[in-house]
Design a protein with these regions (language model features):
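Conserved ankyrin/ankyrin-like repeat signature
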Residues: 63, 106-110
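Ankyrin-repeat-protein effector appendages
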Residues: 113-137
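Alpha-solenoid repeat scaffolds
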Residues: 24, 73-74, 102, 106-107, ...
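Conserved hydrophobic site in ankyrin repeats
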Residues: 67, 110-115
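Cullin-RING E3 adaptor/co-adaptor recruitment helices
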Residues: 1-73, 80-100, 128-135
Length: 137
């Protein structure tokens, strides 16, 4: 009922009200607002890496695309990333592995397209990117 009443307000009142609402509130209202304010999220998320993994698990390609655009240079520079008993050459290879592990085909396609557009990860299927780091006797 409250939302219906808010929608019925005139546009000039809605514009005045929205000036007093913090921008972080608008991030999750629709795609346009997410595109405008997605950079504000990083400050409010305690563990950003878990946010990235959760986005991949949910196969949310729109959010994942924005995350890649913000972080791909930093991900490429993170060397020897360790996850469970695996060692990856960089964080991008881990993200690709995690997409495959969780059957996140939309996120995987976004990552492959982004890498091909920026000239990253050429001949990705030929490279041995995972090393198992368990002790053997």
């Amino acid at each position: 009922e409250l939302l219906i009443k808010i929608i019925l307000l005139p546009d000039c009142l809605i514009n005045i009200i929205t000036e007093f609402i913090p921008k972080i509130v608008f991030v999750f209202t629709n795609r346009d607002n997410y595109s405008l304010y997605h950079s504000l999220i990083k400050k409010y998320i305690y563990n950003y890496e878990n946010y990235i993994r959760d986005t991949i698990r949910r196969d949310n390609e729109f959010v994942f695309e924005k995350i890649i655009e913000e972080n791909y240079k930093r991900w490429y520079l993170i060397k020897n990333y360790k996850y469970k008993n695996l060692n990856f050459k960089n964080y991008l290879y881990f993200v690709l592995y995690y997409c495959v592990e969780n059957d996140s085909n939309n996120c995987r396609n976004v990552l492959n397209y982004f890498c091909s557009q920026h000239g990253l990860c050429k001949n990705l299927y030929k490279k041995n990117v995972v090393q198992y780091i368990r002790w053997r006797n």
